[in-house]
Amino acid sequence: MGIRRKRPFAGAVVFTAFLFWVPFQAFPAVQDSKDSAPVDRLNKTYFKKFGQDFGSVIASPGRWGTSDFLKFTALAGTGVLLYGFDQEIYDWVQKQKTPSSINASPYISKFGQGGYLTALAVAMYASGEIFDSPGLRKTALLSLESFLTTTAVVLTFKAVAGRARPNTGESAHSFHPFSFTSGYTSFPSGDAAGAFSVATVIAEQTPEVFVDILAYGLAGLVAIYRVHDRKHWPSDVFTGSALGFFVGKKISRLNKNSSSGNSHVSFELTPHRQSITLSLYF
């Protein structure tokens, strides 16, 4: 069996090209009109809107303005800087492992897995049907849309980049484009992207700060643990997280006017003399 050659230059090109596509999916030129049908039911309207939104996400870079390119420069610079120090940061994270962090891994990692994220969306939608909540249904459907859109893009770039995972023993600059093997699907991180794609939609649909903190906090832990568990390099999780965040933002913005009634999910903590009540409003 021959030894694959490392392609640091090719890897850098693929990495930069991907970063050029990722940022500012949250700033689309196309938005729903106020008369759009509400996207809070799993029906033909939803699937039609899903297709339109997917096309808008893919075409986003063609609508960038000057401010978008300036913001891209900042994000790309951060990503390239991480790429240059991937090995050093990865080694440092490995040295910080403790028995507690290792034991927590199986639980935290679940929040980035596609099966669990899909199950979360299904559970939210079912709850929306049971409680007749357009807000919960819409949050569920947009979460699913954001996750599936993000996943489609992630899988494409994984195949094109073919970056070696840390656990293969190869360097942080080892790329094998179109190898289609699990050991060469490190860039970008699908779990980090999926976690942030859903967390962002949930945060956008709820006005409560503590929900934002919880959603983004869990997504952040998922990203960190992908490096902790030797599955990804730091630049993989940074790019995946950025992708999930901006796709989630854009999906939310594209559907911000397609609502019926109260489309937000609201929480309220009420202290009492001998108890605390958590109220959920749809």
Tell me what each language-model feature is.
Residues 43-47, 79, 91-93:
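A short, ordered amphipathic alpha-helix with a cationic face
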Residues 72-76:
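Alpha-helical transmembrane segments
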Residues 121-124:
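Long, hydrophobic/aromatic-enriched structural stretches that serve as scaffold segments
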